Regions:
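N-terminal Rossmann-like FAD-binding beta1-loop-alpha1 element of flavoenzymes
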Residues: 69-119
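FAD-binding beta-loop-beta segment adjacent to the flavin cofactor pocket
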Residues: 286-289, 343-362, 415-423, 432-438
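N-terminal FAD cofactor-binding segment of flavoenzymes
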Residues: 105-162, 178
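Predominantly flavin-linked oxidoreductase catalytic cores and closely associated redox partners
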Residues: 109-113, 186-337, 347-355, 367
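A conserved FAD-binding loop/helix module that cradles the flavin
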Residues: 367-388
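Long, low-complexity C-terminal extensions of enzymes
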Residues: 385-507
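N-terminal chloroplast transit peptides
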Residues: 1-57, 61-62
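Flavin-binding catalytic cores
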Residues: 312-342, 382-410
Length: 507
């Protein structure tokens, strides 16, 4: 089976090089850190899934509707990295596994406090093989506006051929090279050491952990942070794993022209007129709808992605690709060349990790993806200071043993308020799983008519349970009578489940 590339923790997704068979051993890599673990990450037979708004990896696609021009060169930074030397460093305070945005963000902030940090990754300077799309205000709040290479003043949602919504919220694409360089420079200046290798295992002793690397080196550390994305090979889960799946097929392309306003990104296009001449595709789309997500960079360069918001099991890639081909034909988009092709997957929902446990997680490995949307980039970067502060504080306490330290980090990362919030988001995912195309259109018609504070907060994980309950009532009040009846009929079982789970939560 072909390898599956698991983007680093800040990216909520998995970019698959081919379909994934259940029950077979899977090979994963986080940014660069590879793991082989057949007892974890399993997907329904014949399905693969996509990463966040714009994860990319150059892969073979079984159905490509045009001639493809690929740039196979893998970009890398060229810093003179300070290397970990086991002859002079007997032990470090923190080992970060994975050099993705989340891992580097924590490494940078922990090292600012004088804590010794080693970051392990087979290609620590490699540019991340995924693009990130974010709301501009999310990056502005973290002083990262200089790390956006393209922004759109607003976005648009097409519900059908007659109705669309304009979203007055700027959207941006992350400059991957700039963001990584900024984080790497901070790490280097703070004295973070780097070790180029794969992590094979972590062995826990009473007062430290041993990180076993592929080159034979074993590094002793007080704390281990798993920032490897969705590999789930270092962080433990107990409950059965049965998430929803967000699937997508997309590419950056040079085109003769396209019909979209270059000042607006296309957040969702639920129109289905392009399928009217194919009864099978139309019937399938009616049941399990997909939408177009597009970033127009200019009049003849654009990112196009056909996306299944959430399904269980995921919509097969071949089906998604066929719908994309029909959509492009209908929109009269003639693709001249393709720069990047991506087949991507996001597991959404599912159980939280075992808490506490010795290995600390962040991002995908800590189940931080938004269960209703698939978003995670800004949420994870915003959580990095929380994780870093907890680690620094507990390391500074002479009374802190490794398990109590990790327990504190997990508790700060997943306080009861965040757990309750996630439970509501899982309820939202369950409702979306039950809707067909027409129900989905009615849902988003009501959703984007809410006050900006509410839908902004929902998408950006800024609302907590009391506000989310008001959000739910407002959404129900905004909905049409048909949508209300549908929500009551299909949303009652997941609502009961959410209430039961909330009532059983303990702080």
């Amino acid at each position: 089976m072909d390898a599956i590339v698991v983007p680093i923790a800040c990216h909520p997704g998995i970019v698959a090089s081919d379909d994934i068979d259940a029950g077979r051993q899977c090979k994963f890599s986080s940014g660069s850190s590879e793991f082989t673990c057949g007892h974890h990450r399993q997907f329904p037979s014949g399905h693969s899934r996509r990463g966040h708004r714009l994860p990319t990896f150059r892969v073979h696609a079984s159905i490509i509707p045009l001639e493809v021009t690929r740039d196979a060169k893998k970009e890398s930074l060229t810093y003179d990295l300070p290397k970990f030397d086991n002859t002079t460093h007997n032990r470090v305070d923190l080992v970060v596994v994975g050099s993705g945005p989340a891992g580097l963000a924590v490494a940078k902030q922990v090292s600012e406090a004088g804590v010794s940090v080693c970051c392990i990754d087979p290609a620590p300077q490699g540019i991340w093989p995924n693009n990130y799309g974010v709301w501009v205000d999310e990056f502005e709040a973290m002083d990262l506006l200089d790390c956006l290479d393209t922004t759109w003043s607003s976005a648009v949602v097409y519900l059908d051929d007659k109705k669309k919504k304009y979203l007055k919220r700027p959207y941006g694409r992350v400059d991957r090279r700039r963001l990584k360089a900024k984080m790497m420079e901070g790490c280097i200046n703070n004295g973070v050491k780097f070790h180029q290798a794969k992590v094979l295992n972590v062995i826990h002793e009473d007062d430290h952990s041993l990180v076993v690397c592929s080159d034979g080196l074993t590094i002793k550390s007080n704390v281990v942070l798993d920032a490897t994305g969705f590999s789930r090979c270092l962080v433990e889960y107990e409950k059965p794993y049965n998430p929803g799946y967000q699937m997508a097929y997309g590419f950056v392309a040079e085109v003769d022209e396209h019909p979209f306003d270059i000042d607006k990104m296309v957040f969702m296009d639920w129109r289905d007129s392009h399928l009217h001449e194919d009864s099978v595709l139309k019937s399938n789309n009616d049941k399990l709808p997909t939408f177009l997500y597009a970033m127009p960079f200019s009049s003849n360069r654009i990112f196009l992605e056909e996306t299944s918001l959430v399904a269980r099991p995921g919509v097969p890639f071949e089906e998604i690709q066929k719908r994309m081909v029909q959509r492009l034909k209908y929109l009269d988009i003639n693709v001249k060349s393709i720069e990047e092709v991506e087949k991507c997957v996001i597991p959404m929902g599912g159980p939280l990790p075992v808490m506490p446990q010795r290995v600390v997680g962040i991002g995908g490995t800590a189940a931080m993806v938004h269960p209703s949307t698939g978003y995670m980039v800004a949420r994870t970067l915003a959580a990095a200071p929380i994780v870093a502060s907890a680690i620094v504080e507990r390391l500074g306490s002479n009374q802190s043993d490794p398990m109590s330290l990790s327990a504190r980090v997990w508790k700060d990362l997943w306080p009861i308020e965040r757990k309750r919030q996630r439970e509501f988001f899982c309820f939202g995912m369950d409702v979306l799983l039950s809707l067909d195309l027409h129900g989905t259109r009615r849902f988003f018609d009501a959703f984007f008519d809410l006050e900006p504070y509410q839908w902004h907060g929902f998408l950006s994980s800024r609302l907590y349970l009391p506000e989310l309950l008001i959000f739910g009532l407002s959404l129900f009040g905004n909905a049409s009578n048909t949508a209300r009846l549908e929500i009551m009929a299909k949303g009652t079982p997941p609502l009961v489940r959410m209430i039961r789970n909330l009532s059983s939560m303990r702080n």
